[in-house]
Amino acid sequence: MMKIIAAFLFLLVTTFVSRCLSADIESDKQALLEFASLVPHSRKLNWNSTIPICASWTGITCSKNNARVTALRLPGSGLYGPLPEKTFEKLDALRIISLRSNHLQGNIPSVILSLPFIRSLYFHENNFSGTIPPVLSHRLVNLDLSANSLSGNIPTSLQNLTQLTDLSLQNNSLSGPIPNLPPRLKYLNLSFNNLNGSVPSSVKSFPASSFQGNSLLCGAPLTPCPENTTAPSPSPTTPTEGPGTTNIGRGTAKKVLSTGAIVGIAVGGSVLLFIILAIITLCCAKKRDGGQDSTAVPKAKPGRSDNKAEEFGSGVQEAEKNKLVFFEGSSYNFDLEDLLRASAEVLGKGSYGTTYKAILEEGTTVVVKRLKEVAAGKREFEQQMEAVGRISPHVNVAPLRAYYFSKDEKLLVYDYYQGGNFSMLLHGNNEGGRAALDWETRLRICLEAARGISHIHSASGAKLLHGNIKSPNVLLTQELHVCVSDFGIAPLMSHHTLIPSRSLGYRAPEAIETRKHTQKSDVYSFGVLLLEMLTGKAAGKTTGHEEVVDLPKWVQSVVREEWTGEVFDVELIKQQHNVEEEMVQMLQIAMACVSKHPDSRPSMEEVVNMMEEIRPSGSGPGSGNRASSPEMIRSSDSPV
């Protein structure tokens, strides 16, 4: 009898649970259909009640038993308007919500941040306004609300989120002090807000870039806070015996203040007059010195139409003007005198010097790189230049055409490439926004760059290295074919050269620590270049109000916890179809390249082979080997 009752109860419970599960997934479906009807979207969603939600709906992930919807991912889907709060109350099993890079506006519904199982919220690059809801789920791991219009204080409840590892609130209008934040936090960015007060001790270990753009913040790692000084209480200088005495005291105080002001003005005027006289004296002395030393600077001639050209010839001495050394195979027919007469335009300033576009009188256009802080002597410099200049030709390597060396001036001459460089193509420049670069073009550019670097590594008995791999040094022809430039310069430079933060973003940890470059550190830099291509984020500090980005660390923090696809450039997601596997494969190659341990990184030859396997010659999207699971990426030893 007991067995029959137990069997009956088991059947009853099983039926009840199955019905509950069915109701749950059905209610999730209805909630999502409600979401689609309430939130306008320019990209069509294939959400239809007639097709299975877990298998076919765009941006939807379900639990393993298909019982509940656990992830909603609609980045760059053209969503606009406010989010419906009641809809998310019904989706209480969500662990991940990614609505980044849309046009959503209004307040962030408080129910979303307090969902019981929510772990990752990616709401950056929208138009959300209002304050950050104070009630937050204790399970939150990743919270990105950056690049919105949020205001008010940062909630103090954040300090109670013991699992939070990544917090991005930059580029908003948040104000007030920074609260204490949880100790497990590994990535923090609060830059470009209106925060004030002292940086709390719980986050002082983060770099200054995490707090930049908040002019009222102080304390480590920013400038020290001023000491708190309290003004002494005013006390009367004479006893107050009645109204008459008080009036005399006030009158005396005014008289003393007026005298002090007069003395201050007199002293200030004297100091100002002294400074003006000193400046006039220095200017006169410089003018006299310039007249005596005018022979050291090449005299401008009528054909020289731009004063910028003098910058890369200012250290050239008259006796050495014809010592421009050309390499075999160069078709140029000019000497240093012709080069110094050329009009010039600054193309950019990098780690090792300034680059100019020089147009000679006969119309020839070349690129001249003026090196700074060269530590090598003449013999060592010439030997290195000979090794660089005599490397066997390769279609993806920009050849060094000529060089010049003197005590005060070191110049390198290259071909001019009309297509610009990969950085300009990927991120745009000051004159305009970036183009929507498709996956095919990105993949081909990076593969050609890899072939060029691999050739540099294999030439001259594998003794050469690049030493300065970054997207601005990946030059492009008009047909967008790649030539890798600026290789072989690193061994000549001073170890004390100040490397800009935008270049540090490409440097391997061991290269930053020792200031010595190897072929393995080149592989790391190329891995960062691949991550830059995949994410659309510039490595290191960029112009404008962009934050300092440690790409390997950022990518690893995302794929460690959640969905690998969250790292990809929204432009790729908008444009491309059937290339997700190739993108994941490329991400795996990039993460192998940026391994913390140099010996764990592949060689550039191996990198080329792996990239060629993704897209064999003549095959289309999706035809490469099937991508491995995201867990493989998360388990790599790349920096966290």
Swiss-Prot record:
Segments traversing the membrane: 260-280
Positions bearing Phosphothreonine: 364, 441, 514, 564
The protein, known as: Probable inactive receptor kinase At3g08680
Membrane-topology descriptor: Single-pass membrane protein
GO molecular function, one term: ATP binding
Pfam assignment, any one: LRR_1
InterPro entries: At_inactive_RLKs (IPR050994), Kinase-like_dom_sf (IPR011009), Leu-rich_rpt (IPR001611), LRR_dom_sf (IPR032675), LRR_N_plant-typ (IPR013210), Prot_kinase_dom (IPR000719), Protein_kinase_ATP_BS (IPR017441), Ser-Thr/Tyr_kinase_cat_dom (IPR001245)
Protein keywords: ATP-binding, Leucine-rich repeat, Membrane, Nucleotide-binding, Phosphoprotein, Repeat, Signal, Transmembrane, Transmembrane helix
Family: Belongs to the protein kinase superfamily. Tyr protein kinase family.
SUPFAM superfamilies: L domain-like, Protein kinase-like (PK-like)
Sites where the protein binds ATP: 347-355, 369
Low complexity bias spans: 226-247
Organism of derivation: Arabidopsis thaliana (Mouse-ear cress)
Keyword flag Aminoacyl-tRNA synthetase: no
Span list, region Disordered: 222-249, 289-315, 612-640
